[in-house]
Every structure is written in C-alpha cells, then in structure tokens.
Amino acid sequence: NFFEISNKQVLRKKYELNNDAYLVGSFQRDTEGKDLISPKLSKGPDLFINHIDKLINKEKNLEVVLTGKRRNYVINELSKRNIKFHYFEMISFEQLNELYNLLDLYLVTSRYEGGPQAILEAGITKTPIISTDVGIAKQILSEESIIDLDNPLNARPNINYAFSNVQNYLIPKGFDKFNEMFSQIV
C-alpha cells in the first residue's frame, strides 16, 4: 500500500540519510542475471548513469538510493565515479513506500518495458519523477516530465499531474482504465 508521507526529515533520519542530500532513486534491477556484470539494457542503466553524470553538476549534494537485486552495473558505475549511494537490497513494501517518500527525484530510464510500476508508485506517493517515454509514462506523467534523451536535464517533475492521473488506475476505478488501456494494445 503506497501513500504520501510528508515528513521527509523523519524518514531520512530513520534510514541514516543526510537531510541536505539531493536523493535520486532507482528501484529496479539493472544487471543481467547470467553474469552479474552486463547491463540489462532494456532498463537503461547506462542512461541512468548518463543522467546522474549530468545532474551531479547541477546538484552538488547528489546521492543515489537503490533497492532490489541485481544492481551490480549501477553500483559499479557509481563507485567508479565516487558518487555516494545507499543500497537497500531486500526491503518490504512498507520500506519501499518510505524510500519513495524521502526522495527528491525518482528516475526511470528504461528503453522499453510494460509498466513500469515505479511510475504508478511514485505518482501515488507524490514523489517527483521523470521518465523516458516508456510503457505508461505518457498516461501518468505530464509532457514536461518525459525525458528527451538529447536534453535530459530539461525534464521537470509535475507531482500534482502524476498524482491526479494515477487516481484513474487505482482499484476499483482503475479496472476500467486498465481494461481500456490494454484493449488498445490487443
């Protein structure tokens, strides 16, 4: 169950994260399972790192928050660059909700995928999010929140727009939108 938690300072203290840090989140796997080195290119971990490389020049106190298994590629790339990160490998849904709520930005950089679920989760928790044009991004996020890969820093989160649109996909109302969306695909 995902929801907004307004007091980020309490959450950051709980997870021992700096209140002055600009926290960017990524909660999906980024590495192929066969060798734990090769990037899972469909998830765009190289695009994530490219965006972080640009963003760190703008946000001097940038730190990355990662969750989930198979985060080897991003962890290795962040380590090479001496970019501070916090890795919470296996967490509960309650903890995941809290981690969304303490972020300054959630970044989806997938090249293709069905969801991603993170767009819905960030929307319902009012987490600032920008995303590549993938899956349901354009159904939930504003045009200004869609990343142009040529100018990635131009993307801007629109929290209220995403929160408003995600309401259409919550149960029970969400079943109608869900069926409508997938009937167009079939």
Functional labels for PLM-detected ranges:
Residues 68, 73-94:
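Nucleotide-activated donor-binding/catalytic signature segment of Leloir-type glycosyltransferases, i.e.
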Residues 17-43, 49-52:
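Conserved donor-binding/catalytic core segment of Leloir-type glycosyltransferases
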Residues 98-103:
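Short alpha-helical donor nucleotide-sugar binding micro-motif in glycosyltransferases
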Residues 119, 128-131:
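Short hydrophobic beta-strand element within catalytic cores of glycosyltransferases
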Residues 111:
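Aromatic "clamp/platform" in nucleotide-sugar-dependent glycosyltransferases that forms part
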Residues 3-17:
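A short helix/loop element that forms part of the nucleotide-sugar donor recognition site in Leloir-type
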